[in-house]
Every structure is written in structure tokens, then in C-alpha cells.
Amino acid sequence: MSDRRAPRPTLLATGIRALALATVLAAPAMAAKADNSAARPANTLQSLAELDGKAPSRRQLNIQHWNTAEGARVLFVEARELPMFDLRVTFAAGSSQDGVTPGVAALTNAMLNEGVAGKDVTAIAEGFEGLGADFGNGSYRDMAVASLRSLSAKDKREPALKLFTEVAGKPTFPEDALKRIKNQMLAGFEYEKQNPGKIAGKALFSKLYGDHPYAHPSDGTAESIGGITLAQLRAFHAKAYTGGNAVIALVGDLSRAEAEAIAAQVSAGLPKGPALAAPAQPTDAKAGLTHIDFPSKQTHLMLAELGIDRQDPDWPALSLGNQILGGGAFGTRLMSEVREKRGLTYGVYSVFSPMQVRGPFMINLQTRAELSEGTLKLVQDILADYLKQGPTQQELDDAKRELAGSFPLSNASNASIVGQLGAIGFYNLPLTWLEDFMQQSQALTVEQVKAAMNKHLSADKLVIVTVGPKVPQQPLPAPTDKPSEQPLGVPEH
């Protein structure tokens, strides 16, 4: 199954924010277990579908790591609760590596499972399905991913890995598949023209990042996709899907020796080549408001400025600070003032998205068009007041408790752990990063959180994009515990 979407605004949770806010402490290192597969009772599990959503019980994590001969970094956690394993290979092959051809990274990733020697897309899908295995792929701004979930029994594991290695390392890029996927992407671009949220997001990144590689959509554009050739896809794959440019994460019912063999097989099956350099750091954009006229009853509001990269030591303080501002659900500053007291929106959130280089800090909401200007000023005032006053001790204590409660719950599945390992490896974080993050977060003071938020954010530096109709404006309702205007229903689009 392919993930052919533009990156999520969180990473952009994306995925990556979850590494900090919803992950478990790494346990103290313990000796690697010897292979005890012969001692385990025989399992009758024949397909991943039989798991029916069940997750392994809570386990301690012992992150083992090494490098393959080709230069791939490997992170492995042995987890014997279920007879299965998860493999995630992360490449520095996202749209920031597109160069002058926006969309080449996304198209390359989307084409991985369209053909290998002797198999078309249908045969590949049937091959994985017949083994009870799942293949996944996705392309984002920093990274591209290929993943496999398989039963760990040798008769299922080995053919699934063989097929995965061919798909990731030796795709044939069939011409008919390229035409089909281009048409799908072009249809998606047309749909996005009717989606004010998509319009706002694309405009925001363009304004915020200017000429930087993060500026263009990770899927490319309608203008760029049409001209991409098979030769360009093959060249990008040969450059970006190399062993030296890969991080291999493994979690599951495997011994260290089995994990080493899997990593070696996958790494050796990739093109040979070094790691690609990260993009340069972006420069601060000019603050200001851009309005895009769109016929709708609501106006989308997006506010942003440059935040931090994954290596920034202020991330624990910013994470907690944002949780209080707008990163949680009900009870955050933004939700309390904008929704709960005034009923202006269905939801409002803020997020830091740390990336290889400075990712965005964003605030996102939509409201009735006739209240959009007042709502925008209210949001700006809330941010300015929060930066001036900082969080209260009660807010910080509550955020710490929420964080502490989320950590032990996040290791319930191999899939969540393998994603965390992939991020640790890709962003070159220490193996103790999870434990360090938790300890540092719990030790933070109100003054430290306030200082970090003010160091990295300014209410005067916001890049703002609004998408909606131009209509006469009305004053905002006064705040109350029971707003007369209830929050809007399901948001448009």
C-alpha cells in the first residue's frame, strides 16, 4: 500500500512529533537474548489479519545498533510477544532532494512497488498478500520510507524479505504505471483546487520558505509532474535509495543474528552510494498577511514562522510550551479562548514540526468568514500574551502529567516502536533520546519554558495565509462559559 499524500502538517506527524509526545522510555540496556526460536512452542498464526488489532503486551526496550557493510545505520529491538516483525527503511529521499524537479522524489517512491523483474504491480501485491505480509511506502519532505510487516516464521519471512528487497532496491519503473500514477496525481491536484485547507497550506509553505527546498509541495506540482521522465526516476533512485543513505529499523520476533542477516540482505540489495547532505538552513521569511479569495462560508487561517530542527536542545521545553498553547485538545489556551469561550471554531491547534533543518511552527483553524478578521486578531493576541506571561505552574504541571501518562502507553505495538527507531536513526539522535527527553521535560520550570518559547517565537514575525470569501466583518461575541454561538459542525473540506 502506498502513501502518496503530501506530508501532514504535523510530520509532518507528523509522525515526527509523536516521537516526543507519544513514545516510551528506553529501558536500561540488557544483554541480547540468544535465539530461542527452537524452544518456543509452534505458532499457528498464518496471516497478519488474524491479529485482529491485538497488540503485544507492554515490554522493555533494548535498542541494539550497528552499521551494515554498505553504511546503513541499523536499530533493532527484539520483541517476542507475537510471531511477527516490522521492518522500516528510511531514506534521505524526500522532496527536499527534488532539486529543480519538484515531485521526482514522490514519483520515485510511488513507483517502487509497480514492478520488479518478472512481476507487475498485481503480482507484487499478491506476493505479499499470499505470505500474510504488508508492504508500505511513503514520501515526505525530509524522507522517503519503505516498510514491511511479516510473520517471522522462516518460510514466510524469507520470501517476503526477498520480494521487499527487490521492490526497494531494483524497481523496474514500468512506463504504463508511470502514466497511471501521473494521472492520479494530476487528478489530486485538481481536487486540491477546491480544498481551501490545501490551498492555504501550499501558499503558507511557499511564503514561509521562499526558495528553500521545503517551499514546494512534496508531491510536486501539476506543472512539474507531467515532464518527469523514467530516466529521472531511475537516476533519483540510484542516488537516493542507496545503502549509505538508509536507516534500517527492525522490531519483532527475531534474534540478533536474524536481524543482522535481514539488515545485511536489505542493505546489499540497494544501490551503492553515500548519504545525501541535508538541505541548508532556511532564512526567516518576511512577516505579513496573504489572503486568497475562495467561495465558501468559512475562512481558513494559517499562521506560521520558522521553528527548530531535530537537534535543537530546546525541543523538550518547546514541546511542553506548545502543549499548553495549542498542542493538546480541550483546555489549551487557544481552544479555551477561541472555541470554548466564544464558539468561533470547531478546533484550533498549534504545532512545532522539527525537521532536518528548521521546520515550521504553525497555528491552524477555520471560522465563519464574517468573523475571520476578529478571530485572526484574537489568535495573535493569545500568542502574544502567552509569550509575555508564560504558562502558569498549574498548566505546566498538567502538561507534565499528560506527557508522563502517554509515554508508557506508546510501546503497545511493534509499528509504533519501529517508527520511533526510524526517526532516531534518521535524525541521528542518541539512543537514550527518549529517556533524556522525558527526564528533561519533567525537570522544566515555568521560567525555562517561557524563555524557550520567546527565544524561538515572536508574535511579530508571523507569516499568515487566509483562504475564504471577502465579506463584511462582524464583531466577535464576548467570551462566556456558555457561548451563544456553538462551535461549527464538521469543518468544510
Per-region residue spans from a language model:
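Short, surface-exposed recognition loops or helix-turn segments adjacent to catalytic cores
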Residues: 177-184, 279-282
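M16 family metallopeptidases and their MPP-like homologs
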Residues: 77, 82-112, 121-168, 182, ...
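Gram-negative bacterial Sec-dependent N-terminal signal peptides
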Residues: 4-30
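Short, polar/flexible loop-turn hinges at active-site or ligand-entry regions and domain interfaces
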Residues: 115-118, 168-176
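Histidine-acidic residue clusters that define the catalytic metal-binding segment
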Residues: 41-64, 206-246, 276-282, 407, ...
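His/Glu-rich zincin catalytic helix
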Residues: 30-134, 147, 152, 158, ...
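N-terminal glycine-/lysine-enriched basic segments
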Residues: 189
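Generic structural signal for individual residues within well-ordered alpha-helical segments
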Residues: 125, 179, 226, 234, ...
